[in-house]
Amino acid sequence: MSDPCGKKLVQEISPTMSLWGLEDRHSCQGQPQPDQDPVAKEASASELQMKVDFFRKLGYSSSEIHSALQKLGVQADTNTVLGELVKHGSATERECQASTDPCPQPPLVPRGGSTPKPSTVEPSLPEEDKESSDLRPVVIDGSNVAMSHGNKEVFSCRGILLAVNWFLERGHTDITVFVPSWRKEQPRPDVPITDQHILRELEKKKILVFTPSRRVGGKRVVCYDDRFIVKLAYESDGVVVSNDTYRDLQGERQEWKRFIEERLLMYSFVNDKFMPPDDPLGRHGPSLDNFLRKKPLPSEHRKQPCPYGRKCTYGIKCRFFHPERPSRPQRSVADELRANALLSPPRTPVKDKSSQRPSPASQPNSMSLEAEPGSPDGKKLGTRSSPGPHQEGSTQTCAPAGRSLPVSGGSFGPTEWLPHTLDSLPYTSQECLDSGIGSLESQMSELWGLRGGSPGESGPTRGPYTGYQTYGSKLPAAPAFSPFRQAIGTGHFSVPTDYVPPPPTYPAREYWSEPYPLPPPTPVLQEPQRPRPRASGDPWGRVSDLAKERAGVYTKLCGVFPPHLVEAVMGRFPQLLDPQQLAAEILSYKSQHLSE
């Protein structure tokens, strides 16, 4: 198929372009041109197809692209065709908007013959109208505002304009300003007025209202403008803008008194700027935004952040907000003490102090240990010492009440000395720990003993968890520093049967707060023994080091946590000596019992 100019149409090559005459109309004018190369025709067709696809992706229909290409020609560039499409599309939209069908479609009638009720669609108000309808009406005391802006000397009408503009910027539409009518008269030297033209401009906009006044017999009769202000604000449920408290009007009607107390908005002028307070009814009242609304917005009840921050020393009594503190409800000291009392094990009834502290003469200072029936000798292992005043009730036993001291061929295991239940765990009296860490150390030294034997002979110290009983126990007493009580540590060790314990280093004290007296002179042995070198595997050395270390860890932890918690956790983990790990275990133990 050929055109009159002797040129084949491109639509034969690309059937998708058959909608339009893609020939160049301008090329047909004049002399006929020779036929182009088929490769060139195919390239031009593919380029044209790319343009068409591009315009279709932009959202234009085939008819719009057809008309634009017929008007501009195939060789027009993309920007020119796109500009034509934009113009054509905007014109089409205007035609569609102008030709909208004014008659609505008839409603669907259900079967049964009953006519449906006409659907009444409430007109949706614009967002600005909704916002303004939610705001309260504003009634401004014009005389008070103008005199305040004029520093109580000049009636400055500019102050009224500043107040009106402030409320207009917030979206208020119902604004009324009351001014006595004599203020629009010619000003006198004794009553100066500035910017008087503002009153007339606001009156034309129906914002300002002049209260009536007249002259009778050469005298001006002025109506009380304050009554106009309060009455209109009360009837319209609005807000009064004034620094006057209207005491005389509060006494006239009880409802006016309450209304003035709740709806009076005071203000200040700062460098020609109208500034009402952010809290019109005080610190604990509503915000200014909610004060000017009919329906207050829900506000976040969040306390003001504490000005001291982390340096605040008020604790839970601080009424400000601390973001660094946990959100859980704070407990008072009394509640903490009650919770700790629930965690502590039940205590046995304590007898009188006279029964707690028996006389030294009535205290037997002996401890007998029977060998097992299967032992080869079958003898009784016993150690006796003369009664002395060096023992107290807190250091008389080496095992909890109701437990006998196990003996296995003269070999003692430290793990058998430890209590296995929480109820049998000993605890230190709290009244002995109320004096601080110093009292605690003296209490611990009294319970365990810091050294044993003579000065030339260092003995191992007893650990704090071998167990001890309360005052008044009926178990046989043991010397305060006997090696049987000091046998705590890893591994077993043996004690010779003919071993005689050394005399005590410190005499007894009647009260724990008394200082230690000077130690008695040590008797000189006739046959001094040679100091035996301690082997690396000596169990006495290991026991001594372990007991000292556990005693130090216990003392440190008791300065932070209650003693019964420390004893309970260290009883559960006898081989654990790391204070940090023990502290973590104490916290977890405490949280578990709190949850219970």
From Swiss-Prot:
Its cofactor is Mg(2+). The gene is Zc3h12a. This is Endoribonuclease ZC3H12A. Oligomer. Found in a deubiquitination complex with TANK, USP10 and ZC3H12A; this complex inhibits genotoxic stress- or interleukin-1-beta-mediated NF-kappaB activation by promoting IKBKG or TRAF6 deubiquitination. Interacts with IKBKG; this interaction increases in response to DNA damage. Interacts with TANK; this interaction increases in response to DNA damage and serves as a bridge to anchor both TANK and USP10 into a deubiquitinating complex. Interacts with TRAF6; this interaction increases in response to DNA damage and is stimulated by TANK. Keywords: Angiogenesis, Apoptosis, Cytoplasm, Developmental protein, Differentiation, DNA damage, DNA-binding, Endonuclease, Endoplasmic reticulum, Hydrolase, Immunity, Inflammatory response, Magnesium, Membrane, Metal-binding, Neurogenesis, Nuclease, Nucleus, Phosphoprotein, RNA-binding, Stress response, Ubl conjugation, Zinc, Zinc-finger. Mg(2+) binds at D226. It is a peripheral membrane protein. Disulfide bonds: none annotated. One of its GO terms (biological process) is negative regulation of interleukin-6 production. Residues 356-368, 383-398 have a biased composition (Polar residues).
